[in-house]
Regions:
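Mobile genetic element proteins and their domesticated derivatives, centered on retroelements
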Residues: 1, 16, 33, 37, ...
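Basic, flexible linker segments flanking DNA-binding modules
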Residues: 1-76, 175, 229-238
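Hydrophobic (often cysteine-bearing) scaffold residues that line and stabilize catalytic clefts
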Residues: 9-13, 29, 60, 64, ...
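RNase H-like two-metal-ion nuclease catalytic core shared by retroviral integrases
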Residues: 54-59, 146-148, 154-157, 168-190, ...
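An active-site-proximal beta-strand-loop segment
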Residues: 70-113
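Active-site beta-loop-alpha junctions of metal-dependent nucleic acid enzymes
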Residues: 97, 115-137
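Short small-residue beta-strand/loop micro-motif enriched in glycine and branched aliphatics
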Residues: 109-115, 168-171, 195-196
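C-terminal domain-tail junction helix/linker
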Residues: 162-166, 188-240
Length: 240
């Protein structure tokens, strides 16, 4: 347990229990793990911050219906994709800089299909994210869900999705929960690697994000996935 905590201090007792069961062959009751953690002074380093919704575009060119309708599951990979953009900050001396992360999440295996980082939150950011996803999955024609951010409501973006054989879906006004799973991913990433830390360069912040997404896809166990990683579930589904 000490080794797990030293390697990943963000893990709470539930995730420590999952690690013990999966990788050490030691199935232990969660309450017992909690008691031992308390006796050893093991506590998750996760920090929390307030959450908010993306503001809707002021002059949208295209507003599709909420086709997804909170049906946050899929029978196979590349059936339903969610996307969103989130903001990070880093500091160079007393100057605050912003960095934006755009990502696409698959609802079957919860893997991050693609992501992009830019200094500006613009249409180029979401186009790059989509282009990467299409390049990696050329035969994918998923339902594509987002909030009403200005980048997703342009006619150009809608036409891009249509050309790729995708159906566009969009959250209702002010309903963050309509895009809940990817909002949840932002929370996981920031709690485990961002909150409580001060990044002093763009390179340092970008490196953290890239490394975390690789860790999330290939190494981070999820109970909703049967204590498997997203890429393990993806491989299992494709082999079925």
């Amino acid at each position: 347990m000490k080794k797990i905590h030293e390697e990943s201090p963000d893990k709470g007792y539930r995730r420590i229990r999952d690690e013990l069961t999966r990788y050490y062959g030691a199935p232990v009751n969660g309450k017992r793990v909690l008691r031992i953690c308390r006796s050893l002074g093991i506590q998750s380093t996760i920090k929390y911050a307030r959450r908010g919704c993306t503001r809707s575009a002021s002059d949208p060119q295209y507003l599709p219906e909420n086709v997804l309708n909170r049906q946050f599951y899929a029978d196979k990979p590349n059936e339903k994709w969610l996307t969103d953009v989130t903001e990070f900050k880093y500091y160079v001396g007393s100057t605050v800089h912003k960095l934006y992360l755009s990502a696409i999440l698959d609802l079957c295996d919860r893997r991050i299909v693609s992501f992009a980082l830019r200094d500006t939150n613009d249409s180029a950011l979401v186009h790059e994210t989509l282009d990467q996803a299409l390049a990696a999955n050329p035969n994918a024609h998923p339902l594509f869900h987002s909030d009403r951010g200005f980048q997703y409501t342009t006619r150009v973006f809608h036409d891009k999705l249509t050309a790729a054989g995708m159906t566009q879906s969009m959250s209702r006004v002010g309903k963050c929960i309509d895009n809940g799973p990817i909002k949840g991913f932002w929370g996981i990433l920031k709690r485990e690697r961002y909150y409580g830390r001060r990044f002093t360069s763009r390179e340092q912040l970008c490196s953290m994000i890239r490394e975390y997404i690789a860790y999330y896809n290939f190494s981070r166990l999820q109970r909703r996935l049967g204590v498997h990683t997203p890429m393990e579930v993806c491989a299992q589904c494709r082999a079925a």
